[in-house]
Amino acid sequence: MSRPGIEIILMRQLASYLAVPILIVDRERDLLFFNESAEPILGRRFDETGKIHRGEWTASFRPTDANGLLLPPEEQPLTRAIDRGEPSYRRSWMTGLDGVARVIEGLAFPIATRESGLMGAAGIFWEVRERAAVPPSLAQQAASRPSRSRHAVEVILLRRLANRLLMPILVEDSEGKLLFYNPAAEPLIGRRFAELGPVQLRDWNDEFQPTDEDGSRIKVEDHPLSVARLQQQPCYRRFLYQGLDGVKRRVDAAAFPLLGLCNRHLGAVGIFWEGSR
């Protein structure tokens, strides 16, 4: 049995700390691990299932589209992340091992480095629920909270992992201040993080001027990172923006709340990639 790479080990350690449903597959698409937060959706504890081989977990969870048709493997986010080496997002129905069918949204991204190549993929998924508007008072409370995110073990693990990956990742604290983005994100941001340092998301929003594909400006409270941080719900969105290098780009972005041990609210994580035209 081959030993998992350090990135797989770090991803599993990080997932164990987070209150966000996460599962990990290897490059053969064998299910290596899912965390405690994923157990209510998958309908079984990982201790009861252990590693699930390729094909078995697809047959067990029976992902289907809105019409009830089984999704072929090539349309499933984890398979696309492995086969195409790029992130993939999809909304679908999934039946857990408890027999309950749920509507879920899922993002999968490859776990890959320049040194080791593709080692597997991580899936972050959530049950679809209606999102309420963020009350202004909640946004003010979040902004006034003292931030201790930078020194949290979850953030330290995430930064160690992100700095090794080819996937662009951005992290902000519970106040909406940028904690870091990894080297893979620098070409999309248009500047190295060492040259920029911490900024507030509101200032960030003004600088990048994100818009929908029809040109409508995206309000800061509607940005995926804001939704994830303030509503503590994952969020996916496609938008256009102008980087700090002056280049206009079209990206897909998914953000999820950085909820740590004891449900500590540490901020939000953004994963983004250039969308197809």
Which residue ranges define each predicted feature?
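PAS-family sensory domains
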Residues: 42-43, 50, 189-190, 197
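PAS/PAC sensory module
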Residues: 75, 89-93, 100-106, 122, ...
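Terminal output helix/cap of sensory domains in signal transduction proteins
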Residues: 48-94, 196-241
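Output-coupling edge of small sensory domains
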Residues: 109-111, 256-258
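Sensory coupling linkers of modular signal transduction proteins
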Residues: 114-152, 260-277
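N-terminal capping loop/helix in small sensory signaling domains highlighted by a polar->aromatic N-x2-3-F motif
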Residues: 35-39, 182-185
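Sensory modules in modular signal-transduction proteins
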Residues: 2-27, 148-174
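Conserved hydrophobic beta-strand signature of PAS-family and PAS-like sensory domains
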Residues: 31-32, 178-179
